[in-house]
Amino acid sequence: MTKPHFAVSCQHYSFAVNAFVDVIREFDAYQYDFTIREEQTHEIIEDVTNLKSELGVIYLSSKNTEVLSKMLKRNELEFTELFTATPHVFICDSHPLASKKSITMDDLQDYPYLTYEQGEYNSQYFSEEFVSTLDSRKNIRVRDRATLFNLIIGLNGYTVCSGVISAELNGRNIISKPLDVEEYMRIGIISRKGVVLSRYAREYIEALKAHCM
């Protein structure tokens, strides 16, 4: 009997991991060979282009839509929006700004900005974070989510994301606060044009919607 296969590549979103867990629990197969990759943005696009992953999870904004849309079109990929989010700041619950209802960029100037390294594609177009490092005096780049959240706690640092947070994966001492900017993030999936999605991919998309709506 052939093992069912499914692979997804995503930016460092806890809801993407939770949706992956839901798919495995939903099918509860005797055997399977599934893969989830938290990667740099260009790697996600390459994985889906080369059918290494059936789906990718990324975001588009006014700052990166033009560049990434051209890249997706060139690689015969399509972007399907799942939801729109306003940018939020992730900080620890003991942070000096933790009591504020919303946070401004000026509020953050004295604190380290944690971002995910994008390798040779380290530009704002491929950044996972909505705010450019050029807007911050103190910048630290990391490769994995655990390190990022440890530094947020240890250094009173912050990162900028969609605001969808998982206490189980990120820890209960990480909190989310709205960032006071007039912008938004369109989070969605990328897939190959003309490729019929597997039942696992379809279920994964539904699980993503459930975690993000």
Question: Where do the language-model regions lie?
Answer:
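A bilobed periplasmic-binding-protein/Venus flytrap-type ligand-binding module shared by bacterial periplasmic
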Residues: 90-98, 186-197
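Short, well-ordered beta-strand segments
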Residues: 5-11, 56, 90, 114, ...
